[in-house]
A protein has these predicted regions:
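Short glycine/serine/proline-enriched coil/turn segments at secondary-structure junctions
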Residues: 226-227, 239-240, 334, 349-353, ...
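C-terminal soluble interaction/assembly domains
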Residues: 350-426
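Flexible, processing/modification-adjacent segments and terminal tails
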Residues: 137-186, 238-243, 249-337, 442-459
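A generic structural motif
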Residues: 220-224, 247-251, 345-347, 374, ...
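Solvent-exposed N-terminal domain segments of exported/luminal and surface proteins
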Residues: 40-243
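N-terminal secretory signal peptides
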Residues: 1-38
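Extended beta-strand-rich segments in extracellular/periplasmic secretory proteins, especially
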Residues: 107-110, 115, 119-120, 189-210, ...
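Cysteine/selenocysteine-centered motifs that mediate thiol-based redox chemistry or coordinate metal-sulfur cofactors
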Residues: 293, 299, 398-451, 459
């Protein structure tokens, strides 16, 4: 017989007391980032009940089981409300996997190394932007790995979405109607590059002459023919009170146009339920939202490590559920020992269709694992949940340079009020020879300038 030092409800009581007292530090048995700094493993910060789904459910669920409508109520407290409804009423399933202990499998290596090296150096300046001593921009990694406030948590993800200095994601998008059929199917490319806080691309940590910018980001569509060549470029100022400059190329006009940049709750293409505002749950400048509050803490189920389908030559994923068996990606989830739930409200938009958003973050990495937005009446409206992975499986491996690539693998963006679903997956390549790449300086010239938009539109 094994005697447990902490009973099953110890963690629940701890999280409730911490929230009531406004104590925001992560970890139950010890400060989380002290445990990570010691060994690269967060396990010492949590009791056994938070380190396995079998322990949490007292043996009623175990690794390898499927969560279905028949047993989802056992883990209802671990799921955001829209995902629960998808399982309960729409045939969604989740496969359970062991909890990942090694923190290096949950973020890019260089990003994590910079987080540890620069821990404690970040501060907000008088305008609320993240700086180091001397007032210069952030120098790399997560500025607030042991965040104490909601705005620190959101500042971290807004500052660096994909956690690489540069990335190009080859994407397949599928937009489904309420009847469960794919109504639109797009091949798309999404590029990101950071001019500041660089951790592996020279020059580091800043790209000279661009220290006033936070990121370059673009999206273009390579198929079908009706959308081919349509492309958009966002250039983000470092100042988080300012909207990005948004440029677009529409083949019918054969020229670059500047678009209104505050219309971030509208789809870029027909059929999609995905908005610019949704990107990484933080697609808008930090101070165009406000009233950031930590409103919940506790364990969660999330797809943080098993999303890559190495067995498919193009990394494509299988689907299930919904009226036609096409609505949901096959998804593997695991028990996250501690998630932090943050609420925020749009303040910089005159006609935002949402009144607030709730975002769940893995406390170990401050990675957003799910989001639910609410309409102006306060009813659930839209959900965004992603799956992540280290791109290493058996003998299969995709590298970001010296280390296996870490990134998102697939996403659901679901409108619960209409029943429409957008599914995205990161694949190896798309139409036109565009292939997923990471930390490649050529990404800028190929995808992140107005000249690049023209070339993509005419290519």
């Amino acid at each position: 017989m094994r005697l447990l030092r902490y009973d099953h409800d110890y963690s629940r009581r701890h999280f409730m007391k911490s929230l009531a007292r406004g104590v925001a530090g992560a970890g139950v048995l010890m400060p989380l980032w002290d445990a990570i700094a010691q060994s690269g493993d967060a396990s010492k910060a949590y009791p056994d009940e938070l380190l396995s789904i079998e322990g949490y459910t007292r043996g009623r669920l175990k690794n390898g089981d499927l969560i279905t409508a028949a047993n989802v109520d056992l883990v209802r407290d671990l799921l955001e409300p829209i995902k629960y409804q998808q399982i309960k009423t729409m045939g969604r399933r989740l496969k359970l996997a062991p909890t990942t202990g090694d923190i290096t499998r949950l973020s890019p290596w260089e990003y994590l190394e910079a987080t540890l090296r620069n821990r404690g150096k970040a501060q907000f300046d008088g305008n609320g932007n993240i700086v180091v001593d001397g007032g210069k921009p952030w120098i790399g990694g997560n500025p607030f790995p042991d965040a104490k406030t909601g705005i620190e948590i959101f500042a971290s993800i807004t500052l660096s979405w994909g956690r690489h200095d540069a990335a190009f994601y080859a994407i397949k998008e599928y937009d489904l109607g309420v009847e469960g059929d794919v109504r639109y199917n797009y091949d798309a490319g999404w590029a990101e590059m950071s001019p500041v806080a660089r951790v592996c691309m020279e020059p580091m940590p800043y790209w000279p002459a661009h220290e006033d910018k936070l990121r370059f980001q673009s999206i273009f569509f390579a198929s079908p023919d009706s959308a081919k060549g349509t492309s958009f470029l966002n250039v983000w100022p470092y100042d988080q009170h300012s909207f990005p400059d948004l440029y677009g190329y529409v083949p019918a006009f054969k020229r670059i146009r500047q678009f209104p940049t505050d219309q971030r709750f509208e789809p870029l293409i027909p059929g999609s339920t995905l908005y610019l505002s949704d990107a990484w749950t933080a697609g808008d400048p930090l101070y165009t939202w406000g009233n950031y509050q930590i409103i919940g803490r506790g364990p969660a189920l999330a797809a943080i490590s098993g999303g890559w389908n190495a067995d498919h030559p193009n990394w494509e994923h299988k689907t299930h559920g919904g009226p036609k068996g096409k609505t949901f990606w096959d998804t593997t989830v695991e028990l996250v020992p501690e998630a932090i739930l943050v609420s925020a409200e749009p303040t910089g938009f005159k006609r935002a269709p949402v009144s607030k958003k709730h975002v769940w973050f893995d406390a170990r990495t401050m990675l957003p694992i799910a989001m639910v937005t609410f309409d102006r009446r306060g009813d659930p409206y839209h959900s965004f949940d992603g799956a992540y992975a280290l791109y290493e499986s058996g003998e299969h491996r995709f590298m970001d340079g010296r280390h296996p690539y870490w990134s998102w693998a697939h996403v659901h963006a679901f409108d619960i009020q209409t029943g429409r679903m957008t599914r995205l997956e990161q694949v190896k390549s798309i139409t036109g020879g565009h292939a997923t790449a990471v930390n490649d300086p050529a990404i800028y010239d190929r995808y992140l300038t107005n000249a690049a938009l023209m070339h993509l539109g005419n290519g």
